């Protein structure tokens, strides 16, 4: 079933064709800087550091490649020598460079310190335009972040609708050039998606038929990564919940929770059961025994899916679905589950790590039982929390609350800081999203490295020791990746290193004498990006991801917005209110006006350098990223302006606004034409790492230009019609008035609406003993304001208010003014009444007295809608399609 503009999620599986992506080939080429001046002279690399496993050969090769690119020749009798030596150090990966007229001595106490020192030498060589660094310098650094996790930018996500298992693929997702670039950027860990049962062995289950094949690929990949100082980590969500058909559930019921999860489908595991702990221990022990080169496991322990008997949704009261009656607290349940996992990992590989990720992305605060959960970690287990989730930011005179990941918010969020204080002096991890993120997902990196500096300064001050730098998206090696690597190392205990010095050090290897101008541009981009609307709904659904795929609806069709990370979603839509969250359309527009004004100032610093770097592919792509971002911002602003003008067109019922609306469409076409050469030159642009597809490319943008022409034809039809705009909308069937009469919504269930005394009431006639969940949806008629959804449950004949959509937009369950009532409670058929003061519903302009409405009745696993058939579930939006809503006429 397809509703509105989005294809619902189903069992369709998409296999990405890597051959279509030029960047997948380019990423296999080693990067070498362009030196405008060729130097003469000889060099020698003296491998004095003991390296019996030849782990440093890749880093030595990088040094030689850079020196040859600068014009030098390798000679055993060279006057300039780069020598590595062993010297004891207090910290793993720390290093020292000592320069003289005869060369450079790189000393460290371990191979990884030597590796970092060799990479530092190449950066200094690049910063000096190929000249050897000045004699007399002595530079030392040590990392404060022990683990720095990255990822291949296009490796599989292993879930529908892109369900590909990279351990069963022949594709090498980790070519040598990519590993070298990641290592050079400071990455020392890569994570891949796995499932525990598919890899491990346990006496409780038969082996997966493909297990040996997966283990062989895993071992091969781990050994290859190790040659670059990179350890391979297994990402998982374990113990993974099961259905009643699972063989273990059938044979060992006591291993699982008493009741299924909130969706009434899957069961969590009981850590109090010795068999559960045995299951986890044996599976992990077998994996790490067979592949001891692995770095460890990153496990979402709480928050994403049901794992144990604890609620997966962390804002709910603590209700433990228990059969064993163990009496354990939430912290003890988590501790025992993690302890079994840790013991299994350590039994196979004592140096491997277990990172327990508490994925709590919500804008709202978690329940009390979740707070301070890091205090329950078993020894040796590293808790990890989202750095920005639940943060607050002042924008346009209001306090905004943001969930999930944010680049534009420095952080940390209060809940992260609180957990860091609980863990003070003990290892703790941070989940960041710093290449690109859900704010803007379609470039390799957003050029705002000063934000990296400030985030990592806070990590240092809080004593954070591990960082996961990205999710499925934001993994292309780029300047932001290098910024993260640079910020991970310090020259001592100081947490007040100068931001300008950091930015200059980052810019010099690529931009040399032009670094000061580039730093000025970066700082202006940072100031600009601070204006990005701090709203989780906006970052997920607004046009900045793929504005060229949004169509200009001159009629308020209210097609639903798409989830950019789901490749089966049809992009576009025009129900812009779904994307606004806590922002009004006017506020979002003003935010982008401010953003663009400052971004343009940054471009004024950057673009004068463009001609100088013609032919330097990497710098040309840097210019292209900055330009494309400006076009995305401008195109988003055009759409926001367009929707505001469309609102006026129908509120004022005046065709005068069509002139400015058509001018916006023409300007959008101009932007599209400017985007095409950038998209042709860099196939990374438009690519979404979670959807594993380009959200737009040069071909789709050309189609968008043609689609805009067709939209202009609709504008002319509206202009030339003898009917006023509102009359046309009703005549075309875009809007349909709701008559106040009884309507059947499901067998045995009827509803109707009443409006009187400043209140709207929805009456539901239903069997007295029925159990259901009722969702009631409202949006202003033009679709330019945030939607409102109220959720009510009837259980055992008692109505219970669950929550409303303000939870996601405001960070708390706001007051929608709803009142619950009942008539004829003692009869077989009863009437439930749901009432709101009209002033509490989305605002209605007296000149356009209509409110879009729909309701959804959930009976068990079935969903029934008052209008239409709904659609596949969308994150934060539910199953409603705004396109299907009817129009309530509101007396004003």
Regions found by a protein language model. Give the residues of each.
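An acidic- and aromatic-residue-enriched active-site/binding cleft used to recognize and process polar
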Residues: 109-111, 155, 195-197, 237-239, ...
């Amino acid at each position: 079933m397809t509703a509105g503009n989005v294809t619902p999620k189903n069992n369709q599986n998409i296999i990405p064709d890597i051959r279509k992506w030029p960047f997948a080939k380019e990423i296999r080429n080693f990067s070498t800087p362009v030196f405008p001046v060729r130097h003469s002279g000889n060099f020698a690399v003296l491998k004095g550091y003991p390296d019996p496993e030849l782990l440093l050969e890749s880093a030595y090769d990088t040094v030689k490649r850079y020196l040859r690119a600068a014009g030098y020749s390798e000679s055993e009798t060279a006057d300039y020598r780069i020598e590595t030596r062993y010297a004891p150090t207090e910290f793993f990966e720390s290093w020292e460079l000592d320069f003289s007229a005869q060369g450079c001595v790189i000393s460290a106490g371990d191979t990884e310190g030597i590796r970092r020192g060799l990479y530092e030498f190449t950066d200094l060589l690049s910063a000096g335009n190929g000249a050897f660094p000045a004699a007399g310098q002595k530079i030392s650094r040590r990392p404060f972040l022990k683990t720095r996790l990255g990822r291949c930018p296009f490796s599989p996500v292993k879930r529908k609708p892109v369900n590909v298992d990279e351990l069963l693929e022949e594709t090498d997702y980790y070519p040598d050039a990519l590993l070298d670039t990641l290592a050079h950027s400071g990455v020392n860990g890569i994570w891949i998606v796995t499932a525990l049962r598919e890899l491990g062995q346990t006496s409780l289950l038969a082996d997966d038929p493909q297990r040996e094949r997966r283990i062989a690929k895993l071992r091969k990949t781990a050994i290859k990564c190790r040659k670059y100082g990179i350890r391979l980590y297994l990402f998982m969500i374990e113990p993974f919940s099961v259905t009643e058909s699972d063989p273990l559930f059938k044979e060992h019921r006591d291993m699982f929770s008493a009741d299924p999860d909130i969706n009434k489908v899957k069961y969590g595991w009981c850590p109090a059961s010795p068999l559960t702990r045995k299951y986890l221990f044996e599976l992990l022990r077998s994996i790490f025994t067979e592949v001891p080169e692995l770095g460890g496991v990153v496990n979402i322990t709480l928050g994403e899916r049901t794992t144990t008997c604890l609620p997966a949704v962390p804002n709910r009261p603590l209700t433990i679905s228990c059969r064993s009656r163990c009496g354990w607290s939430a912290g003890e349940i988590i501790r025992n589950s993690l302890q079994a996992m840790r013991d299994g990992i350590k039994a196979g590989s004592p140096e491997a790590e277990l990172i327990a990720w508490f994925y709590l992305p919500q804008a709202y605060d978690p329940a009390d039982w979740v707070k301070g959960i890091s205090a329950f970690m078993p020894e040796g287990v590293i808790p990890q929390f989202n750095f920005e989730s639940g943060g607050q930011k002042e924008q346009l005179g209001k306090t905004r609350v943001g969930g999930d990941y944010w680049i534009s918010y420095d952080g940390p969020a209060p809940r992260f800081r609180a957990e860091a204080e609980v863990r003070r002096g003990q290892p703790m991890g941070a989940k960041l999203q710093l290449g690109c993120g859900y704010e803007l997902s379609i470039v390799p990196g957003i050029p705002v490295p000063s934000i990296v500096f400030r985030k990592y300064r806070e990590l240092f001050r809080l004593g954070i020791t591990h960082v996961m730098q990205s999710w499925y998206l934001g993994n292309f090696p780029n300047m932001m990746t290098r910024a993260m690597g640079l910020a991970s190392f310090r020259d001592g205990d100081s947490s007040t290193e100068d931001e300008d010095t950091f930015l200059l050090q980052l810019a010099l290897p690529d931009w040399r004498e032009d670094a000061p101008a580039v730093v000025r541009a970066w700082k202006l981009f940072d100031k600009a990006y601070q204006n990005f609307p701090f709203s989780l709904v906006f970052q997920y659904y607004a046009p900045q991801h793929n504005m060229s795929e949004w169509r200009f609806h001159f009629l308020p069709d209210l097609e639903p917005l798409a989830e950019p990370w789901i490749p089966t979603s049809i992009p576009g839509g025009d129900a812009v209110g779904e994307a606004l969250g806590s922002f009004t359309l006017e506020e979002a527009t003003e935010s982008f006006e401010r953003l663009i004004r400052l971004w343009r100032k940054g471009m004024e610093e950057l673009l004068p350098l463009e001609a100088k770097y013609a032919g330097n592919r990497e710098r040309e792509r840097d210019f292209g990223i900055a330009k494309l971002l400006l076009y995305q911002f401008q195109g988003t602003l055009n759409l926001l302006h367009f929707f505001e003008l469309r609102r006026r067109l129908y509120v004022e019922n005046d065709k005068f606004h069509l002139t400015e609306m058509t001018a916006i469409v023409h300007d959008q076409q101009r932007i599209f034409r400017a985007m095409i050469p950038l998209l042709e030159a860099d196939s990374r642009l438009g690519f979404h790492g979670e959807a594993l597809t380009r959200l737009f490319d040069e071909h789709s943008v050309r189609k968008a230009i043609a689609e805009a022409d067709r939209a202009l034809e609709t504008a002319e039809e509206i202009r030339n019609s003898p009917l006023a705009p509102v009359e046309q909308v009703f005549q075309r069937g875009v809007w349909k008035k709701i008559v106040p009469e009884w309507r059947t919504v499901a067998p045995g269930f009827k509803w109707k609406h009443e409006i009187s005394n400043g209140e709207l009431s929805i009456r539901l006639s239903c069997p007295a003993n029925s159990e259901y969940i009722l969702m009631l949806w409202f949006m202003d008629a033009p679709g330019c304001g945030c939607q409102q959804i109220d959720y009510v449950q009837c259980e055992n004949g008692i109505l219970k208010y669950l929550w409303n959509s303000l939870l996601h937009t405001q960070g708390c369950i706001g007051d929608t003014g709803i009142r619950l009532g009942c008539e004829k409670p003692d009869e077989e058929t009863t009437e439930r009444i749901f009432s709101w003061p009209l002033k509490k519903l989305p605002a209605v302009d007296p000149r356009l007295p209509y409110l879009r409405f729909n309701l959804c009745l959930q009976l068990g696993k079935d969903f029934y809608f008052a209008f239409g058939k709904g659609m596949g579930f969308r994150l934060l939006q539910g199953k409603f399609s705004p396109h299907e809503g009817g129009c309530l006429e509101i007396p004003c």
